[in-house]
Amino acid sequence: FALLGHGLGGDVALDLIRRAPDRVTRVVLMATDPLAEAPQIAAAREARMVAARSGRLAEAMREEIPPSAIADSPWRDEILALVGDMALGLGEGVFLRQSRALQRRPDQQKTMRRVKLPALVISGDADPLVPMRRQEFTANLMPYGKLSVIADCGHLASLEQPEAVGDAIEAFLNGPVMLR
């Protein structure tokens, strides 16, 4: 099967590949950081977790995905509202578990070097949370990795530029499975 993961979902996809490499045929990673979380980012995340535990989940989400994480567009506010509503709908417990998982995520570089299957890394050209240089690094870690940069796009590519993301994924999935 083919896998696609965004952010923490990309970490989950890499873990599945590590555990069952023969079951995965292709992987798409979006806004996925292959490195363990830096101490200063983990500390800032801890402050957001305290806010969420104190009944301020909406505030924590505004800090987790700030307006600057979304490329300037007429629908920026709509995307931020959607993300905030999703977080509130899922609740504090999910936010806390996901935050803790991000804080504890392992360095995935070794796993990525072993990914011997077609891999597509999708990056927004204006993503400040997982910048394009990091995404380029991610693609280059994998022997068959390819980078697709989405223009006028921040951290949430599938919401900001859904057609461009869909086109990139479709071309990748319909492409040959031949490896370099």
Language model segments and positions:
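Short alpha-helix in the alpha/beta-hydrolase fold that links the catalytic acid
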Residues: L117, P131-N140
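Glycosyltransferase donor-binding loop in the core domain
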Residues: A87, D127-V130, G154-E160
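Conserved alpha/beta-hydrolase catalytic His-Asp/Glu region
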Residues: E37-Q40, R56-R114
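Short beta-strand immediately N-terminal to the catalytic nucleophile in serine-hydrolase-like folds
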Residues: L3-G5, M30, I122
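Flexible "cap/lid" loop of the alpha/beta hydrolase fold
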Residues: L14-E63
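Catalytic active-site module of serine/aspartate enzymes centered on a nucleophile-bearing elbow/loop
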Residues: Y144-R180
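Short beta-strand/loop motif that positions the catalytic acidic residue
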Residues: V115, V121-S123, D127
